[in-house]
Amino acid sequence: MSHEGEEDLLEYSDNEQEIQVDNTKATEVAGNGEEAADGKDGDKKGSYVGIHSTGFKDFLLKPELSRAIIDCGFEHPSEVQQHTIPQSIHGTDVLCQAKSGLGKTAVFVLSTLQQLDPVPGEVSVVVLCNARELAYQIRNEYLRFSKYMPDVKTAVFYGGTDTRKDIELLKNKDTAPHIVVATPGRLKALVRDNNIDLSHVKNFVIDECDKVLEELDMRRDVQDIFRATPRDKQVMMFSATLSQEIRPICRRFLQNPLEIFVDDEAKLTLHGLQQYYIRLEEREKNRKLAQLLDDLEFNQVIIFVKSTLRANELTKLLNASNFPAITVHGHMRQEERIARYKAFKEFEKRICVSTDVFGRGIDIERINLAINYDMPSEADQYLHRVGRAGRFGTKGLAISLVSSKDDEEVLAKIQERFDVKITEFPEEGVDPSTYLNT
């Protein structure tokens, strides 16, 4: 629980990049699932000894949650879920870094729903994230797992929409949410204008916490929201990448947290994901992309480009070449972005061309092919991009088109950063059984 020491959090310098924190009570879980701490302070929060559950039933969740989990087809928890849920459902603060596709969202959704005792008109859970699409997706996960909890109401708030609609929803006792999923800027505005009461919040979650807290303006918004909540609450933070520099900042919000680092930082690439590169000239990319789309078997594919202009032009070319495609980027109207995201998620299109707006956190189950038409500028972004394929430990295929010296350098950094060997795409192609789930 986070309570004492909140003043220290709220007074730290915004330009402080490294903070020395006494965090000896926290526990780190290494990639092999064994406890990394020395085992002392066994009665304190974070002193976790390995529990390897064979099924979600072992977590002793509410019957309503168990039914929803069965409906979703989940039988066995992932590694991060095994390590985290047994403690998080009892209110333990959590700092969790685990690779994409391991079900981090389900950890905090199930944990907060398990603890939720809905009171009409009271917000009990706040979830913050950095992207509107991600907020929308998290809201949908809450709806999916709370389907047998009819009294639970969830709402999503983000910028670019009419604030009056948010206020109307909040002031109506019939629609006022118990769970709020939001981007920091919009929620801060609602708090500032006294349009939302956070004095009853029991769970405070930050998803993609590194992105949320590394930007000073967004971090200030989070602090203002944090001040509006009670001192006695659970705080949980999650991300696929969590640098050594950002961890002390995260810990300022936490008290004696359970720290879960599933797989060490050098091995964050996904199990089951086949990764290849193709070396070619820039002018050869369109022909090679068409060949790949013709030759490869896939359910849905996401193609990453480096700019809005290239996204629009490539989508036009694909549609003209009889490859029905949809594009999503950050420069379109908010309503249009959400509509296109929904259309792709609901399988109305099999091909999506996107900038990095879809490169972090977005979860669409049918994607099993990711193509870097343009290489990312940094190694971490590669992880988030290719993580769209092979979600939840399933198979997938990632192909990167390498056309410049800069691309070669990024490819080398990716292999060094994640301790992975990315091989050249075979001329004869690849066996579909290596990247398709049977």
Curated annotation (Swiss-Prot):
Domain of life where this protein originates: Eukaryota
EC number assigned by the record: 3.6.4.13
Gene Ontology biological process terms in this record: mRNA export from nucleus; mRNA splicing, via spliceosome
Domain Helicase C-terminal: 272-433
Catalytic reactions on record: ATP + H2O = ADP + phosphate + H(+)
Region Disordered, annotated ranges: 1-44
InterPro entries xref list: DEAD/DEAH_box_helicase_dom (IPR011545), Helicase_ATP-bd (IPR014001), Helicase_C-like (IPR001650), P-loop_NTPase (IPR027417), RNA_helicase_DEAD_Q_motif (IPR014014)
Localization: Nucleus
Any Pfam family hit: Helicase_C
Record domain Helicase ATP-binding: where: 85-260
Function statement: ATP-binding RNA helicase involved in transcription elongation and required for the export of mRNA out of the nucleus. SUB2 also plays a role in pre-mRNA splicing and spliceosome assembly. May be involved in rDNA and telomeric silencing, and maintenance of genome integrity.
Record text about domains: The Q motif is unique to and characteristic of the DEAD box family of RNA helicases and controls ATP binding and hydrolysis.
Name assigned to this protein: ATP-dependent RNA helicase SUB2
Organism the protein comes from: Eremothecium gossypii (strain ATCC 10895 / CBS 109.51 / FGSC 9923 / NRRL Y-1056) (Yeast)
Taxonomic classification: Eukaryota, Fungi, Dikarya, Ascomycota, Saccharomycotina
Gene giving rise to this polypeptide: SUB2
